[in-house]
């Protein structure tokens, strides 16, 4: 199985829905589970600091609309709080270039029509690779196997085309 799994967190339902059965099936063999949020709506990180589900005031929207929630669900909190090994917040800076990379098939496995939220895990992975201290903290090594969860395709075809075009120029 994967040594690392990057899970996008909005209200936490999808991440909890993945973690719970994987934990049941794999138990102690479960790899590192890493939550990923937009820094503009990092309600899980805020909840970790407060040690209780907390509301985040969203003053600016992220391109990753599906992650722009501002509040973790109580049920997701009960599952994710003890299950996630790490949680990272990301900016929107890499979204367009990574969407273009998926669209052009540069990551292997062919072309993928990946929407904005689908880049969250890869955005966090790339950021970790650029930060040696974070890379070490996340315990990556030469035999690491990473699972990235993509959550949507081109839900807004016009925005998708715009971001892929912008991403190809970066």
Q: Model-derived features: where do they sit?
A:
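Active-site-adjacent helical/loop segments in soluble small-molecule enzymes
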Residues: 72-141
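Glycine-rich phosphate/pyrophosphate-binding loop at beta-loop-alpha junctions
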Residues: 1-82, 136-170
């Amino acid at each position: 199985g994967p040594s690392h799994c990057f899970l996008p967190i909005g209200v936490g339902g999808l991440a909890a829905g993945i973690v719970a059965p994987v934990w049941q099936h794999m138990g102690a063999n479960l790899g590192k589970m890493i939550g990923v949020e937009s820094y503009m709506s990092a309600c899980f990180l805020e909840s970790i600091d407060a040690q209780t589900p907390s509301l985040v005031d969203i003053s600016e929207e992220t391109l990753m609309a599906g992650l722009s929630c501002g509040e973790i669900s109580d049920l997701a909190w009960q599952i994710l709080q003890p299950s996630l090994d790490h949680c990272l917040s990301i900016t929107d800076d890499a979204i367009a270039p990574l969407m273009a990379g998926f669209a052009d098939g540069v990551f292997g496995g062919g072309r993928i029509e990946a929407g904005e939220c689908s880049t969250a895990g890869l955005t966090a992975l790339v950021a970790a690779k650029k930060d040696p201290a974070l890379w070490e903290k996340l315990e990556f090594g030469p035999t690491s196997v990473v699972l990235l969860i993509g959550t949507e395709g081109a839900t807004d075809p016009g925005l998708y085309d715009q971001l892929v075009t912008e991403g190809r120029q970066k």
